[in-house]
């Protein structure tokens, strides 16, 4: 919940940095290729007396190695940019509970968790601060809304405070079903798709 919005914001902030890094990488790529061409030309002339075929093979080998080196450099810079963006995304995730829209995000995560375990008698686990946000009247309203949606009596009992950044964990009373919608668990579950989205937007 809210992951796409956060990702888009961080990716937008990272674009300038990415452009700079990639520009440097491209310049280095050109320098590598230019140097390789000069080296190839020099060696080609040096061994020209041995035969045109040998000279051409040497030239092609040097250029192929240079292209491979340049490609490797670009891939390294791309991964570096993605990693920096992910780190910024994680930093922003930690700050999310301080934002005005966080309560709405938290409510949606609770509703999603209740849906995933199927309602009924449930235990709601939050961090200490979020238990202050979800007061008894909010909890009652959530129960009523979920009963109407699921057509099933749903009771949300507050459990112990957990050491999570934010979000929620929902458990059935018999502990057989658990929905971990903590912010960190949600981030980890979506890490591959977030990486793909960052790569798509930046490159």
From Swiss-Prot:
What SUPFAM superfamilies does the database record attribute to this sequence?
Answer: V-type ATPase subunit E-like
What InterPro entries does this protein map onto?
ATPase_E_C, ATPase_V1_Esu
What Gene3D superfamilies does its record include? ATP synthase, E subunit, C-terminal, F1F0 ATP synthase subunit B, membrane domain
- Can you cite an annotated GO cellular component? proton-transporting two-sector ATPase complex, catalytic domain
Q: What is its main location?
A: membrane
Q: Where does this protein reside within or beyond the cell?
A: Cell membrane
> Which membrane topology term applies here?
Peripheral membrane protein
According to the UniProt entry, its GO molecular function terms are: ATP binding; proton-transporting ATP synthase activity, rotational mechanism; proton-transporting ATPase activity, rotational mechanism
Q: Which UniProt keywords apply?
A: ATP synthesis, Cell membrane, Hydrogen ion transport, Ion transport, Membrane, Transport
Q: Which GO terms describe its biological process?
A: proton motive force-driven plasma membrane ATP synthesis
Query: What family, per the record?
Result: Belongs to the V-ATPase E subunit family.
Describe its assembly: Has multiple subunits with at least A(3), B(3), C, D, E, F, H, I and proteolipid K(x).
List the HAMAP family: ATP_synth_E_arch (MF_00311)
Stated role:
Component of the A-type ATP synthase that produces ATP from ADP in the presence of a proton gradient across the membrane.
- What's the name of the protein? A-type ATP synthase subunit E
Q: What is the lineage of its organism?
A: Archaea, Methanobacteriati, Methanobacteriota, Methanomada group, Methanococci
